[in-house]
C-alpha cells in the first residue's frame, strides 16, 4: 500500500511539473538553455521567415506554429521573463502579467522587412506617403560572416492629434456658373475637407537592425513606416544600407574570400604547414609539400563567405602566396651550393608587360 501511495505521489508531481512547464520555448526556437541574446534573435529571425503564415498558406497549423514561435521569443528575449520561465515555466510568466500570448507578431518593426522587398507598404493605393530615409550602416566583415544585431537609437518625427481643426485632403474641382441666357462659365475651385488638427512631435525610438549572415554591400534592411511622416498620409520607409568596411586580412569577392600570406624562401622551396585564423575564430590549416612560387594560389572549399540565400553554402577561401627573399648577401660557397642543389639552367632575362 505504501508503494502504491509513493507511486501516485510521483505521478502527481510529474503532472504538476508538466502543467507548470507548459511549452518548451527553448525547443521551439531550437536553441540551448544557455543561449545568449544574439543567438536567440538569430534563431527567431530564421524560423520566422520559414514559419510565417504568408509563406505557409497550405499549412493549417501555420498560425499556431507562428504564435508559439512569437511567444517563445517574447519570453526568452526579456531577461525578467526568461528568468521567471526558467524557474517556474510558462505558468510563472503568465502570473507576471504578460508574455507568452503569441496572438500576433509584435516584432515586425524590430526586424524590418521579412521578405526583402522594399515596396508597397504605404497603405491603400492613392494614399500619400512621406519620403523614404536611407542610412548607410557601416559593419565589419566579421559581423557579416557571423551575423550581428545593431541597436539604433533615433528621434522620429510623428504627427499627433491636437486641439482644433484644419483643412485637409484638398483637391481642385471644376464648377459651372450660368452667366446669362445660354451662357456658362467653367472655373476651377479648391475644395478641402475638415480634419482634426495635428502637431509634429519628436519621439524616441529604438530599432534593432539585423546584419544578416552573407549580406553584401548595398543590401538593405527596410523598416516600413519608420521614414518621414506625411500630414495627410502614411510615413515613408527607413532603409539601412549595408556598407562593409575594409578588412586588414581578407577581401570579399561575391561569396569568395581572398587573403595573402607571406612565406620565407626556405618554406617556399621545402614546403610548410601554417594556420590562418578565420573570421569566426576557427583555424584553417594550410599545408604545402611542393615548391611554392610567388603568386601561387591555394583554394580551400567551403571556407569562404556564407551565401545570403542559404547560409549552409559557402564560397572558397583563396590564399595567394608571396615569397620573402633573404636580405643577407650569400658567400661564393653558398652560391655554388645553391647552383649544385637546384641544377637550374640560366634563364636569359626577358622584359615583358605582366599587367
Swiss-Prot record:
GO terms for cellular component: endoplasmic reticulum. The lineage of its organism: Eukaryota, Metazoa, Ecdysozoa, Nematoda, Chromadorea. PANTHER family: DNAJ HOMOLOG SUBFAMILY B MEMBER 11. Pfam families: DnaJ, DnaJ_C. One of its GO terms (molecular function) is misfolded protein binding. GO terms for biological process: protein folding; protein maturation. InterPro entries: DnaJ-B11-like (IPR051736), DnaJ_C (IPR002939), DnaJ_domain (IPR001623), DnaJ_domain_CS (IPR018253), HSP40/DnaJ_pept-bd (IPR008971), J_dom_sf (IPR036869). It comes from Caenorhabditis elegans. PROSITE patterns: DNAJ_1, DNAJ_2. Gene3D superfamilies: DnaJ domain, Urease metallochaperone UreE, N-terminal domain. Residues 24-89 form the J domain. Residues 1-21 form the signal peptide. CDD domains: DnaJ, DnaJ_C. This is DnaJ homolog dnj-20. Keywords: Chaperone, Signal. The keyword Signal applies. SUPFAM superfamilies: Chaperone J-domain, HSP40/DnaJ peptide-binding domain.
